[in-house]
């Protein structure tokens, strides 16, 4: 042990030790019992103390315990700028505590503990008010977090819990200028505004008014040319419209006709295209700015449309099964009633005369055997208040068309089943006296100035081939050129047989449009029995060229788009007319008559097959000499005009280059002179 450890303070007065033990803290020991401390205290009273000295005195902490010294290992910081009195005060204080006497508290609590190390004095700065506030906040927050709220821990009962839909979970941040608050079913997609919906229906007049617009996207249609326009998405249709420099392209695709859709790349490089596939082919839209948003909306509407279609078919099948079971039950009840009536009648006859009873018993099997031969079937007939007349069959076996129109390069627009006989549908569409359907159909295509619709007349003296002609004005939406064109229509009835099929070909010529004198649009209408009580309408078209044209592809695409739009309009108008003029009825069918009808139909179909085949329609037939010469001269004149324009541009550029060279030469001469 060193000398420092054995060192103890020595005082002239013996009571000083006891006083030290009683006071305990070194301040009291130094101020009351130590002579040196008294001297220093007197010197302190003589030195004037300022406020800074008082603050330092308050912040002085003396640590005599070893554990406390370990916890606060700070050094003594001296301010060199203090006054002489302040420095002497510190030196006196330090010298008074060099004795390193352990505190009485430590001696009393741990008598056997080793002697403590020398005391350490630290200068601790008092925390500011800001730090105190922050620490108080942390303490209060920690206390609150530990306590918690009992209301947050209580779970809601099962009756209160509700399942939120994705649309409710998603923030409602739609554009109020472009959309309304109403949503499409339970999806997060909003309907378009009233003005946007109105503008859409003005562009696509064949789309039903109740088919509301959801949204539109800027894109391009990939055909022979790239048509830049807008793709409109409604509840049931995909509609594309383009009108650039007079070239119009319109496409209408029903979602129920879509078989496949996918996101693809344009030209194999840019992932900004969407491919739509139907039974008629594939359509490619590219150049989408927001392809994912457009594809998501298409997929959502397509899935909802297919779901509604499946549910409707299931409901129809369920109703058919119920009606079939009810019919079987009614037939069984009626047969039982008839048998009971026959038995009662036979019993009465037995009581009257035995001979008559024998004859009745002999004839009864014949009468009972004939009852199952007749059956009641559902059919469709014209209403009593209908303006149309039809006296043909309303119940028949299904038939077929004689040839496939696709072999003649025709494009099938629609195949539509209707709840009526083929003859009823033919009378509604091509009746000579009642033309309400035809007038509504033409006006729906923006037709006006319709001439009087004449009756069909015979062409070659036979009643099988009939023809009629009329014309009307159709509005055009070209930015330049004529605002309307005259359409000359010629309708020819090729076949009119209520037992097999109907065939009508409509030819339309529009000479006022570009290359209008070189082509005509042919539309074929075929109607046959789809089953015993319904019919099937097939609409197809092709373009018949009588001359050549350098815009042939554009003309055919324009005709196709117009025909597709007209087919949509025709389907809607026909459904309305059939609903207003046709009703359901019950008829009695005999098996013998049915078998006889089958034989007659087979014979007629054989006769149709033995007939000469129809003329194959060639899309680009040979050009007549005079017409070909005229077309060739027009083409050469057009080419000559282009060459002349190019030569003029060339001369202009040559002259401008010569003027520029002349000016450069002048500038060089001026520089040489200078």
UniProtKB/Swiss-Prot annotation:
Residues 1-633 are cytoplasmic. It comes from the Eukaryota. CDD domains: PH-GRAM_GRAMDC. Disulfide bonds: none annotated. The modification Phosphothreonine is found at residues 110, 143. Residues 655-674 are lumenal. It is found in: Endoplasmic reticulum membrane. The modification Phosphoserine is found at residues 113, 140, 149. Gene3D superfamilies: Pleckstrin-homology domain (PH domain)/Phosphotyrosine-binding domain (PTB). SMART domains: GRAM (SM00568). Pfam families: GRAM, VASt. The chain crosses the membrane at residues 634-654. PROSITE patterns: VAST (PS51778). May be involved in sterol transfer between intracellular membranes. This is Membrane-anchored lipid-binding protein LAM5. It comes from Saccharomyces cerevisiae (strain ATCC 204508 / S288c) (Baker's yeast). The gene is LAM5.
């Amino acid at each position: 042990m060193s000398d420092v450890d054995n060192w103890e303070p020595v005082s002239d007065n013996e009571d000083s030790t006891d006083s030290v033990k009683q006071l305990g803290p070194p301040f009291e020991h130094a101020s009351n019992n130590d002579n040196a401390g008294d001297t220093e205290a007197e010197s302190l009273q003589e030195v004037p103390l300022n406020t800074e000295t008082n603050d330092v005195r308050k912040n002085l902490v003396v640590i005599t315990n070893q554990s406390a010294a370990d916890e606060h290992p700070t050094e003594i910081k001296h301010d060199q700028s203090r006054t002489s009195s302040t420095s002497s005060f510190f030196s006196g204080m330090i010298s008074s505590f060099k004795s390193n006497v352990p505190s009485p508290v430590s001696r009393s609590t741990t008598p056997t503990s080793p002697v403590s190390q020398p005391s350490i004095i630290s200068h601790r700065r008092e925390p500011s008010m800001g730090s105190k506030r922050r620490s108080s906040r942390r303490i209060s927050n920690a206390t609150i977090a530990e306590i918690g709220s009992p209301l947050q821990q209580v779970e809601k009962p099962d009756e209160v819990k509700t399942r939120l839909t994705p649309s409710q979970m998603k923030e409602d941040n739609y554009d109020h200028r472009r959309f309304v608050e109403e949503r499409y079913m339970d999806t997060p997609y909003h309907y378009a505004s009233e003005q946007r919906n109105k503008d859409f229906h003005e562009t696509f007049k064949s789309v039903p008014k109740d088919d509301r617009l959801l949204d539109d996207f800027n894109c391009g249609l990939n055909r022979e040319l790239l048509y830049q326009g807008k793709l409109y998405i409604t509840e049931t249709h995909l509609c594309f419209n383009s009108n650039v420099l007079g070239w119009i392209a319109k496409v209408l695709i029903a979602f129920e006709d879509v078989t496949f859709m996918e996101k693809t790349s344009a030209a194999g490089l840019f992932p900004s295209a969407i491919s739509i596939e139907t039974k008629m082919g594939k359509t490619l839209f590219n150049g989408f700015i927001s392809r994912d948003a457009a594809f998501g909306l298409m997929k959502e509407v397509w899935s909802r449309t297919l779901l509604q279609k499946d549910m409707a078919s299931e409901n129809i099948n369920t109703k058919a099964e119920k009606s079939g079971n009810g019919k079987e039950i009614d037939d069984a009840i009626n047969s039982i009633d008839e048998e009971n009536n026959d038995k009662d009648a036979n019993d009465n006859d037995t009581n009257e005369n035995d001979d008559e009873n024998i004859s009745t018993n002999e004839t009864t099997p014949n009468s009972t055997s004939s009852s199952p031969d007749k059956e009641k079937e559902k059919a469709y007939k014209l209403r009593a208040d209908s303006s149309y007349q039809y006296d043909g069959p309303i119940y028949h076996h299904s038939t077929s068309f004689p040839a496939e129109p696709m072999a003649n390069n025709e494009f099938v627009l629609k195949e539509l089943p209707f709840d009526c006989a083929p003859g009823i549908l033919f009378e509604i569409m091509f009746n000579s006296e009642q033309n309400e359907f035809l007038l509504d159909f033409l006006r729906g295509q923006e037709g006006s100035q319709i001439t009087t619709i004449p009756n069909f007349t015979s062409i070659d003296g036979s009643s099988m081939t009939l023809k009629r002609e009329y014309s009307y004005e159709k509005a055009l939406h070209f930015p330049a050129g004529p605002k309307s064109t005259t359409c000359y229509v010629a309708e020819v009835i090729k076949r009119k047989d209520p037992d097999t099929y109907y065939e009508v070909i409509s030819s339309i010529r529009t000479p006022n449009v570009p290359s209008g004198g070189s082509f005509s649009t042919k539309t074929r209408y075929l109607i046959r029995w789809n089953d015993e009580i319904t019919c099937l309408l097939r609409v197809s078209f092709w373009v018949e060229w009588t001359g050549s044209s350098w815009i042939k592809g554009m003309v055919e695409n324009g005709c196709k788009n117009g025909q597709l739009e007209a087919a949509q309009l025709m389907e809607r108008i026909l459904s309305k007319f059939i609903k207003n003029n046709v009703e359901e009825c019950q008829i009695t069918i005999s098996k013998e008559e049915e078998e006889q009808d089958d034989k007659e139909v087979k014979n007629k179909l054989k006769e149709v097959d033995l007939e000469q085949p129809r003329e194959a329609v060639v899309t680009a037939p040979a050009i007549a000499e005079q017409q070909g010469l005229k077309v060739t001269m027009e083409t050469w004149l057009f080419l000559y005009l282009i060459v002349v324009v190019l030569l003029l541009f060339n001369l202009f550029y040559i002259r401008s280059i010569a003027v520029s060279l002349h000016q450069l030469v002048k500038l060089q001469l001026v520089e040489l002179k200078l």
